[in-house]
């Protein structure tokens, strides 16, 4: 059953991609959806069965049914498909594991992927390359499953590279668009930085641990030199920064919105961008012995969350607003990892996947219904034309804002509380930025809701006349994701983040000094717990007031000089792209040009074949000049040679203190004769 879960997506991708002309458009859609759905259901069944969650969940007393507790028995299943590398020093196997970390991730990836496949049936109905699109989606899901279930770092790396390549193909699916080409190349090259760091981490890891298997590596960090562990931790962090879009390697994600909207939902909500956080969560035994790395992770995560939230304030593309929201939420996940709260980071990763996929698919429904318009300033009043889409997007937005008792509430607010519960500089820094970010998130989220659905219509009349809710294949994914955005956090929060839950006892390691869940739960003042919620409420009310009742205030705010500078700074994304283009990329290209000009076509020619032939030719020509045919010249050569020989023999006497001065004069006289003879030789040769 395990192999069926893994390889069914590949079967669907292979048949749809290579046999698409035979199975047809409808056949490719049905086949890929069926394969992904089967894998998702099997992964859910396997997750429930190995942890015995089906038994003992409820107790009955009379007519009342009580929820008792999660009753699970830890089980870690390994499947070995054979040896990949077998040498004297290392053995690497094609091995997969199914445990308490991999199965929740696997189910989330497969289930959301199925919903996105189903959504794409209608969304991509008029595209001429449907088979290729569904093949890419299924192939991406397959590689993500490989990444999640790999039992060693090298199998994980296969999935890591696979999703990188397929994400390039998906972002560049409409390859006739120049902007799609640029976005795909940017995403691919930025992720290569992370891939290089991850590769170097493996090269450091192998001699340090002697293995790449998780079971071996995770048992040894306490006995390894801390400098080595810190280096490995930093390299893993760089890899995660590129894949999970953390500053300064964040710039690829907003541009990747050039791909189809289902791609945005699959890659930038549920799967690819969470791969970096999954890598760090999986490597918790290494990071726990590298406190410097944890400090850096916390600062980077908090800074990314705040940075993306401020940039999201001024975006006008509906997909880019949600993209910056994704970067901001990824910052929360990374921040939780830096605080050593890996289970909370994992919970937020899974919870976020549902409501962010809902927001992306809701945006896709709006774009599809409104004539492919993506600028929120050209919309407005769509609540009357797309009431169902408005309802589900409102649910996703409220869950994103950690509204009490919705899915996002059980992880996002807890991350901020845990930051305060650290009682450290990094914890305070994370708490302040996390709380402010919560308010900013509320503002730009309800700015989107207001401009798209609530304000007066600002679009083309024909677009409004043609607007309508999509077919059932769009409504079902939105409805299911909305249900998960409401209830999934409530149902699973005690399992993932509940005090006393040992669900991750055998898969996540937290150093005893870093456990702060009790402090965050019981020692915090109520005001510090409520502060993020207060900021969120303030941001919501402020956005609703400004864009529905006083829209001219924003215009007047931006029209003054300071407002223009701030707006330009935020709209320019802190000028990261300008810095990269002017000071890194252009300088790198110039350096490469100089290398090509001076070395590839200059120095190499001088010291290569051309240079060697020139040296030999000039040397032979100079030697030929010595053959003058004049006897006196030959006599001079003989004299010069003898004098040189005498000088070589007697030269050491110049520094010998036991030799008389008369002998030193004789030696200097011989040297003078050599110089004169050489001078005469030069004159005669002319």
UniProtKB/Swiss-Prot annotation:
Enzyme class: translocase
Function: Core subunit of the mitochondrial membrane respiratory chain NADH dehydrogenase (Complex I) that is believed to belong to the minimal assembly required for catalysis. Complex I functions in the transfer of electrons from NADH to the respiratory chain. The immediate electron acceptor for the enzyme is believed to be ubiquinone.
Location in the cell: Mitochondrion inner membrane
GO annotations of cellular component type: mitochondrial inner membrane
NCBIfam families tied to this protein: NDH_I_L, PRK06590.1
Domain of life: Eukaryota
Sorted UniProt keywords: Electron transport, Membrane, Mitochondrion, Mitochondrion inner membrane, NAD, Respiratory chain, Translocase, Transmembrane, Transmembrane helix, Transport, Ubiquinone
Recorded catalytic activity of this chain's protein: a ubiquinone + NADH + 5 H(+)(in) = a ubiquinol + NAD(+) + 4 H(+)(out)
Pfam family, one: Proton_antipo_N
Stretches that traverse the bilayer: 3-23, 40-60, 101-121, 139-159, 160-180, 198-218, 222-242, 261-281, 293-313, 321-341, 350-370, 382-402, 432-452, 472-492, 526-546, 635-655, 665-685
Presence of keyword Transport: yes
Name recorded for this polypeptide: NADH-ubiquinone oxidoreductase chain 5
UniProt xrefs under Gene3D superfamilies: 1.20.5.2700
InterPro entries: NADH_DH_su5_C, NADHpl_OxRdtase_5_subgr, ND/Mrp_TM, NU5C-like, Proton_antipo_N
Primary localisation category: mitochondrion
One term of GO molecular function: NADH dehydrogenase (ubiquinone) activity
